[in-house]
Structures are given as C-alpha cells and as structure tokens.
A protein has these predicted regions:
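Lipid interaction determinants
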Residues: 4-134
Length: 134
C-alpha cells in the first residue's frame, strides 16, 4: 500500500510541475522598447538607442529609457506589476529622448497592468502604454 501511495505522490508531483508558468516568470528576461504613448497614439521607440527593460527572477528590474539607465524592484499579482524603489541616472537628452524617458518613467512609477501576447509585452499605467518585444 505504501508503495502505491508513493507512486501516486510522485505522479501528482510530476503533474503539478507541468502547470502553467506564473506571470512573473513570463516577464523574466530582456524586453526591447518598440513603442510608447497613449494606446490610440503610439510613438515608435527611437531606433538608434537601446531602450528596454530586463526583469530578473529575483524581483529586480533594470533597463534604459533611451536617455538614462534605471533600476528598481517589481512584484507581480495576477496581471498587475508593481514597481518600487525605482532609481535612474539624471542625464539630460534631446527632446525626443526625454519624451521617451518620461513615458517609461510614468509607467514605472507605481502599478501597471501587463499583457504578454507571443513575444510582445504591453505595460499600461493610466493612459500611458509601453510596448516591448523579446
């Protein structure tokens, strides 16, 4: 009897290991910024800069807005990602880069809704939307 219980336990453990990933795990990795702005008026990300975000498994986020480097902490609950302790360098850049910087900073100020479809991540905070790809 104990032998059968052990076999059932191992099978149940194997099945539970095959369940869907948590949303935080799917956020993990590097994402390149491709667009930003209100949902109905997206602006393409500046092509000649390496703007994007990297979500680590340890709950930290790092990246570049196209003007300044940034870092902070994130937590996920359902389809909400909450950013905290976000800091960035304080360089001044030309107007297009500063507009992109402002959009990234606006989304990272608090809690954003996120959606992943294929290789595209959408972060929305109030009226500001960031679109990123893997």
């Amino acid at each position: 009897m104990k032998k059968y219980l052990l076999i059932l336990f191992v099978i149940a453990l194997a099945i539970s290991a095959c369940t869907a990933e948590e949303p935080s795990a799917s956020l993990t990795g590097a994402w390149k910024l491709t667009g930003y702005g209100p949902a109905d008026a997206q602006t393409p990300a500046i092509a000649d800069v390496d703007a994007g975000l990297t979500f680590s498994e340890d709950g930290t986020v790092t990246g570049n807005s196209g003007c300044n480097g940034l870092g902070g902490v994130y937590t996920v609950q359902g389809d909400q990602v909450t950013f905290s302790e976000v800091t960035s360098t304080l360089m001044a850049c030309d107007d297009p880069r500063m507009a992109q910087e402002d959009a990234v900073q606006q989304v990272l100020t608090d809690t954003a809704t996120f959606k992943i479809e294929g290789n595209t991540l959408t972060l929305t905070n109030n009226d500001m939307v960031l679109v990123l790809t893997r």
